[in-house]
Design a protein with these regions (language model features):
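Pyridoxal 5′-phosphate
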Residues: 1-291
Length: 291
């Protein structure tokens, strides 16, 4: 039995698939193009009769690149396979419609949208087989045993009711602001967009991913922290790791360049003056704008 995923997935996917591989499954890992996207043709070429599941994220948590999930799911279905997408980074930050994407399973979490870190949800299309990891009392329709965290579930529902009606408005506003941030940062000859083709489109609006020449991410993070700004070198879930980002290296970015990566993330509460203040600080640290 085979499972197909991508090299840019979160460790929550990759580590669990590594465990399946140790138990005898075949796991094929697809590489993205230099623009950070898994091409439909790449998946189609990898499909076979023994592929039970394809799992490709909706949008990358480091670069913000949105994947062509609808097309990828269609390819998986044409070969008789199920399709799952990790939509945790994109939920309530970009339009997501399971009736359009036609995925069989979609996972999301509350901590990315201001809800409890204990909250999350799973969309499972009717008829898709499911075996629970935690067995016991049969809660949640037998899908996850244990007393339900009602408070966290209600919190996630409240956040969804608040943010969903204004999703399109917030998406457009934050995308415009982050585009302006990129323009400010790229004034420096030492700062480059990780995905220059996606600066103004096809990405999550609240993530800016850059590469800084001649700088170590760790030093920049410390210097920015002193100035009141919190950024990361890659996934926020990998804080403390000194390894180059597996996402960036999978895209073909050399390790020495990936060592100078920064991930700047923000939500719909961000103000233009906040981003300008950050840009001023980083430009000062990297020697200023082009003359």
């Amino acid at each position: 039995i085979s499972v197909i995923t991508s090299a840019i997935e979160h460790e929550a996917i990759l580590d669990n698939l590594a465990q399946l591989k140790r138990r005898g499954f075949t796991v094929d890992i697809l590489k993205p193009g230099t623009h950070g996207v898994i091409e439909p043709g790449t998946l189609d070429a990898a499909m076979g009769d023994d592929v039970a599941l394809v799992s490709i994220m909706f949008a990358n948590n480091e670069t913000g690149a949105v994947q062509p999930v609808g097309e990828l799911a269609q390819i998986a279905h044409s070969h008789g396979s199920y399709f799952h997408t990790d939509a945790i980074q994109g939920y309530l930050h970009a339009p997501i419609d399971v009736s359009v994407l036609r995925v069989d399973a979609l996972s999301l979490a509350g901590h990315k949208v201001g809800a409890s870190v204990a909250s999350g949800a799973l969309f499972l299309r009717r008829g898709v087989p499911f075996e629970p990891l935690i067995r016991g009392g049969g809660q949640e329709a037998g899908r996850r045993a244990g007393t339900q965290d009602v408070r966290s579930a209600l919190g996630l529902a409240a956040v969804a009711r608040t943010l969903y009606p204004r999703l399109d408005e917030d998406h457009a506003r934050v995308l415009s602001l982050s585009g302006c941030l990129y323009e400010r940062l790229l004034e420096s000859p030492r700062i480059h967009a990780t995905l220059p083709d996606l600066v103004h489109t096809d990405r999550l609006p609240g993530i800016a991913s850059i590469l800084v020449d001649g700088c170590e991410s760790e030093e920049l993070i410390l210097q920015l922290d002193v100035r009141g700004f919190c950024v990361s070198a890659g996934s926020a879930c990998s804080s403390g790791s000194t390894d180059a980002s597996h996402v960036l290296t999978a895209m073909g970015i050399p390790r020495e360049r990936a060592a100078g990566s920064l991930r700047i993330s923000f939500d719909d509460r961000v103000r233009e003056q906040d981003l300008n203040a950050f840009a001023d600080a980083l430009l000062d640290l990297t020697g200023g704008a082009r003359s």
